[in-house]
Each structure stands twice: as structure tokens, then as C-alpha cells.
A protein has these predicted regions:
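A Rossmann-like FAD-binding core segment of flavoenzymes
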Residues: 1-48, 163-170, 174-181, 185-194
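Alpha-helical scaffold segments in soluble metabolic enzymes
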Residues: 3, 12, 36, 48-52, ...
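Generic secondary-structure signature for well-ordered alpha-helical cores
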Residues: 6, 18, 39, 43, ...
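Hydrophobic residues embedded in beta-strands of well-ordered beta-sheets
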Residues: 9-11, 64, 77, 220
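FAD-site-proximal beta/loop scaffold in flavoenzymes
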Residues: 35-87, 128
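Short, solvent-exposed amphipathic alpha-helical segments in soluble enzyme
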Residues: 52-56, 95-96, 183-187
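A conserved FAD-binding loop/helix module that cradles the flavin
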Residues: 80-111, 135-143
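Rossmann-like nucleotide/phosphate-binding core characteristic of flavoprotein oxidoreductases
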Residues: 105-225
């Protein structure tokens, strides 16, 4: 939309084609009569509680950085839904909330078991937290967005923490045709079979198995080719 037409009321909008830099192309203008314009842009997650808790935030999404179990940088605090990153559909939020709840419950059960096994049981929150999560203390794998990939959720992976690692991402601008490729060093661990169009308004999803991550050491990179 390059112009809204009307004085006291909306009468029409002018739309234009854009180039690869999202700049309107002169001569492509088209007038579409209408009486209402709805805008849903620039949504930002609300994370005052996250900041107060000392949780590390992703500067791109403005939401918490999480691992593949949706656990934040603060042990025992999990994040999901639009507080984590803006979603396309409520169904996506619901599924992510179910996943976060499952992982949080597993964490709580592990904490309880660790405390029961400890001869010196403590009711101190910080001491209790230190006893949790030991079974998930694998080396973390960084998830790095490259090229047209603007961000990823999660930003880090504990390979053995979940049976399947769900990687979600958005592109920074429209890409007419490309494939998703995920690499570890020189090795391609995932590449989509078919090329397709990518747009920033649609969240993309890739599932990686534990077998695909088995030989990864430090990081994986997510890009389009």
C-alpha cells in the first residue's frame, strides 16, 4: 500500500509492485476502492516480566532466547506463544504452549526427584534449582540464522533433550523461490526437497531428529539456497 485515498473517510487505497529492496516501482500503481483499511504490523512481544527475571532476550524478536525445550536462559523458566515470538495462527500458539507445558512438567518432576535423592533436602529455591536439569546438561548447539533467514526459534539446542527439534524461522523479505538448507560446518544435515516462495508474514518450520544432530558439535546454520 503506497497511498490511502480520502479526506474524512477512506475511499480507496493505492497499491504498487515493489522491487527486490521492497521499494515501490513507479508506473505499477493501482487504485482499489474501499472504505476500511486494517493494519497489523510491527507487533512486539511484551516481556517486562522476562526483563525483571533477568532472562536474555533476542534483539530481533524481542522475545526470550530459548532452547529446543523452550527453556529460557534462566533455569526453570519456559516461554511460548506471542511472548516468545509473534505467531501466524492461534493453533501454533496452542501447540507451542502444550510443548512448553510438557517440558516444564518434566523439569519439575526432575527437580522433585533430585531433591528427594539429596540427603540434605532444601526448600531454598536457588538451591533446589541447582539440583535440577542435570540429565539435560549436554553440550549446547548454537542455531545461527544466515542470509535471508531473519531469526530462529530456538537459538540453541540440547540434542538429547527432545526427540525432535522444531526450528521455526521467518525471512527478512520475500524470496521468490528457494530451498531451506541447514548445515553443520561443510555438512548439509537438512535440505528441503522442493523450492518454494518465502514471505516474512509466514512462519516456516523444520523438524530435525536426534540422528540428524548426532554429529553436530558447536553450531548449525539455517539459510535459504
Amino acid at each position: 500500500v503506497t497511498k490511502i485515498v480520502g479526506s474524512k473517510r477512506v475511499q480507496a487505497v493505492e497499491v504498487s509492485a515493489v522491487d527486490e529492496n521492497l521499494k515501490p516501482i513507479p508506473g505499477t500503481e493501482e487504485i482499489i476502492p474501499c472504505d476500511t483499511v486494517l493494519l497489523s504490523i510491527g507487533l512486539i512481544p511484551e516481556n517486562e516480566l522476562s526483563k525483571k527475571a533477568g532472562i536474555e532476550l533476542n534483539p530481533v524478536t524481542n522475545g526470550p532466547k530459548v532452547d529446543n525445550a523452550l527453556e529460557t536462559s534462566v533455569k526453570g523458566i519456559f516461554a511460548c506463544g506471542n511472548v516468545l515470538h509473534v505467531h501466524d495462527l492461534v493453533d501454533q500458539v496452542t501447540k507451542e504452549a502444550e510443548d512448553a507445558g510438557t517440558y516444564a512438567a518434566e523439569y519439575a518432576a526432575e527437580c522433585a526427584a533430585a531433591q528427594q535423592a539429596d540427603a540434605a533436602v532444601s526448600t531454598d529455591v536457588e538451591t533446589a534449582a541447582e539440583a535440577c536439569g542435570t540429565s539435560n546438561a549436554e553440550t549446547e548447539i548454537a542455531v545461527i540464522p544466515e542470509g535471508m533467514v531473519r531469526y530462529t526459534v530456538p537459538t540453541r539446542i540440547c540434542a538429547n533433550r527432545t526427540p525432535v527439534t522444531k526450528i521455526k524461522f521467518r525471512v527478512g523479505r520475500p524470496v521468490e523461490t528457494a530451498k531451506i538448507r541447514i548445515t553443520s560446518g561443510d555438512k548439509v544435515i537438512f535440505e528441503s526437497k522442493k523450492a518454494k516462495k518465502f514471505v516474512p508474514s509466514i512462519m516456516e518450520n523444520v523438524n530435525l531428529t536426534a540422528a540428524q544432530l548426532a554429529d553436530v558439535q558447536d553450531e548449525i546454520k539455517v539459510t535459504l539456497v
